[in-house]
Every structure is written in structure tokens, then in C-alpha cells.
């Protein structure tokens, strides 16, 4: 390729990259093949596959994270798993339940210590975000979940009449709050998770008509954005016992994005660890699949996925060995998870 005389392209590129990182922060630009070098403090998502897909072993602390998807796709379940993992490490967690829909019994089944979980059920969006700001600035909270952005209704809308027009109020509220929160989140090393819903844009001819609520501010301020979808049902005979779930990392400032992982969310149990071990084991070549049979180190572990899952539940030592070997081959597994930015739906 023709090159302008007197210009060292590699030096010019390095200069441009360092200038971008100085202006916009570390991780704002990187080569797709680069492995993250900085040691980031993380909290597990409760899913081994998703921890690998995120590239740093979990969700980063001191950052804003957005989890979005359709109704009943597993957004709250994922957030509760992150809370449970943080509490296991001795962390303090808070849940701002703007939807007024948190089920303490379900949270307890996922491993959340509900007795020590801070919970707030605010009346208006301003109140919810003020509470979030106060908790973040205290520096004493490790994980703070806001469920959900769509339920952060501005006070003016609550006090007005039905049918009144309040164009842009919600987006303005989110934009203002995030400008305040982003610095505090970084300084206090708090993980701030926003759960968000999906809306359909009218009159979209090309591309995805789906959009998240609350304007564009959260898209910019979030270091990690994850799209979660229910892709099928898990049945035991005729009874539905769980959902097959797909999560795609659509934005990641900590490692290369566009990785996708699938796992099972079982009713009353949450993310199925043994189901993931089988899927990831097959990806890493640790578990062999021949027809309907699954085997590991020449030992058959079950005919059909559900039987193989039960075998690993009954043999925790084999499950632990598969998990150790999957973690050792995390790079291979992560490469197998890579998809294009527009595969299975465009960015929202």
C-alpha cells in the first residue's frame, strides 16, 4: 500500500492510540486480539461461561453495567447471582426495586443473604437515583442494582394527569444522574448494575427496531452492556422446569466484546452450573459428545443432556475437575464464543 513519505505509520498509530486513551480512558480502544493486561477487581456473574465471555473473569467493580432484554428473560436472576457472589466474599449489597417486584423467597434460593441485603422501593425516579448516589458516595456498598431503568418515572410524570405529554423527561433524568454517578462509582469501586427493558421503535425499515428505555446516556456511560434472551424451554417430561438463555456481550470496555454464551436458568435454582460445565466442556474438548451420549476421559456420563447434568450433580468431584480444566482452557473457550456485532440482532 502507498505510504506518505516521511511518516512512520506504526509510531503515528501508537501516538494516536495513547492520545485516545489519555482523552477517553483505558480500554476505550484496543486491538480485538489483545488480552486484557490490567488486573481488574471483578465479581463473578454466577455463570462460568459468562465470566469467560467477559474476558476478565466476571463483572468489573468501579464500573456501570447494563443488563437488558425482554420480559422474563433472566435480568433480575443475573443481578441476584452477582449479589450472591459479592455477599459470599463478604461484600455489602443494595437493591433499588423501582418495579416493586423483588421476590425475597426466590432471591434466597439463588444464595442471596436477604437478611443483610439493603432494599429500597422508591416512589419516583429522582428519589431512586438520589438514594443510589448517596449509597455509592458512602463507599460502603460493593454492588448496587437498580431494577429497572424503565420504572424510574420522573416525579413530574407521576404528579401530572394521565395523557399529559412529558417528552424527553426520562432521558434527561438518566443523563443528569449518570453524569453525577459515573465519577462516584469509579472512586468508591462500587459496581452499579442497571437492569433495562426493551421497546420497539416505530417505522424502522432497516436494522433492529428494538431500543432500550431511558435515552442514550446509559449506552455511553456503561462499561459493559449485556443482551439477555430466552431462547427455549427445558422440559422434564411435559413439565417446563427452566429456560434456555443466551447472553451476548454487546459492549465491553474491559476486553474485546461480541462474545456470546448460552446457559440454563432453572426455576427455583437459577443458573445451572452443571449444564454449563457440559456445554463448555464440549467446546473445550474435555467432554466428548457422540450421538446422544456424553463422556469424559472415556467414561460415559449420560445419555442426553439432562441425564449428563444429573450425573455431574451426583459426582461433584468430576464436576470440579471439568470446571478446573475449562478454566485452564478459558482462551480456547472464549474464541469459540466470538460472534459478529450484528449476529443474532444488532446493538441497541
From Swiss-Prot:
GO cellular component, one term: cytosol
Localization terms from the record: Cytoplasm
Major location category of this protein: cytoplasm
UniProt-listed Pfam families: RecA, RecA_C
Keywords, sorted A to Z: ATP-binding, Cytoplasm, DNA damage, DNA recombination, DNA repair, DNA-binding, Nucleotide-binding, SOS response
Biological processes annotated in GO: DNA recombination; DNA repair; SOS response
Keyword DNA damage: yes
PROSITE patterns for this protein: RECA_1, RECA_2, RECA_3
Keyword Cytoplasm: yes
Positions with a binding annotation for ATP: 69-76
GO MF term (any one): damaged DNA binding
Similarity-based family: Belongs to the RecA family.
PANTHER family: MITOCHONDRIAL DNA REPAIR PROTEIN RECA HOMOLOG-RELATED, RECA
NCBIfam families found in the cross-reference section: tigrfam_recA
Free-text function comment from the UniProt entry: Can catalyze the hydrolysis of ATP in the presence of single-stranded DNA, the ATP-dependent uptake of single-stranded DNA by duplex DNA, and the ATP-dependent hybridization of homologous single-stranded DNAs. It interacts with LexA causing its activation and leading to its autocatalytic cleavage.
Protein name according to UniProt: Protein RecA
Protein species of origin: Gluconacetobacter polyoxogenes (Acetobacter polyoxogenes)
Amino acid at each position: 500500500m502507498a505510504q506518505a513519505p516521511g511518516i512512520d505509520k506504526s509510531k503515528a498509530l501508537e501516538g494516536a492510540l495513547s492520545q485516545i486513551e489519555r482523552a477517553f480512558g483505558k480500554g476505550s480502544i484496543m486491538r480485538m486480539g489483545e488480552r486484557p493486561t490490567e488486573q481488574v477487581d471483578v465479581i463473578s456473574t454466577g455463570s462460568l461461561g459468562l465470566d469467560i465471555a467477559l474476558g476478565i473473569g466476571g463483572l468489573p467493580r468501579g464500573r456501570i453495567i447494563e443488563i437488558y432484554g425482554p420480559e422474563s428473560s433472566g435480568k433480575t436472576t443475573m443481578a441476584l447471582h452477582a449479589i450472591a457472589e459479592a455477599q459470599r466474599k463478604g461484600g455489602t449489597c443494595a437493591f433499588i426495586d423501582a418495579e416493586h417486584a423483588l421476590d425475597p423467597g426466590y432471591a434466597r434460593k439463588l444464595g442471596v443473604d436477604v437478611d443483610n441485603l439493603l432494599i429500597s422501593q422508591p416512589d419516583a425516579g429522582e428519589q431512586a437515583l438520589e438514594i443510589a448516589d448517596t449509597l455509592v458516595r458512602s463507599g460502603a456498598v460493593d454492588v448496587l442494582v437498580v431494577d429497572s431503568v424503565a420504572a424510574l418515572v420522573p416525579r413530574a410524570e407521576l404528579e401530572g394527569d394521565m395523557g399529559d405529554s412529558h417528552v424527553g423527561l426520562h432521558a434527561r433524568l438518566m443523563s443528569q444522574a449518570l453524569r453525577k454517578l459515573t465519577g462516584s462509582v469509579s472512586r468508591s469501586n462500587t459496581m452499579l448494575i442497571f437492569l433495562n427493558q426493551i421497546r420497539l421503535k416505530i417505522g424502522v425499515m432497516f436494522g433492529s427496531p428494538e431500543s432500550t428505555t431511558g435515552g442514550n446516556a446509559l449506552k455511553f456511560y456503561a462499561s459493559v452492556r449485556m443482551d439477555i434472551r430466552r431462547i427455549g424451554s427445558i422440559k422434564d417430561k411435559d413439565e417446563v422446569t427452566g429456560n434456555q438463555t443466551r447472553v451476548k456481550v454487546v459492549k465491553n470496555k474491559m476486553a474485546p466484546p461480541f462474545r456470546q454464551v448460552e446457559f440454563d436458568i432453572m426455576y427455583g435454582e437459577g443458573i445451572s452450573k452443571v449444564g454449563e460445565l457440559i456445554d463448555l466442556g464440549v467446546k473445550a474438548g474435555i467432554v466428548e459428545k457422540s450421538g446422544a451420549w456424553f463422556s469424559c476421559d472415556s467414561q460415559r456420563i449420560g445419555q442426553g443432556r439432562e441425564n449428563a447434568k444429573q450425573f455431574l450433580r451426583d459426582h461433584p468431584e468430576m464436576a470440579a475437575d471439568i470446571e478446573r480444566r475449562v478454566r485452564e482452557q478459558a482462551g480456547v473457550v472464549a474464541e469459540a464464543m466470538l460472534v459478529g456485532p450484528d449476529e443474532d440482532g444488532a446493538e441497541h
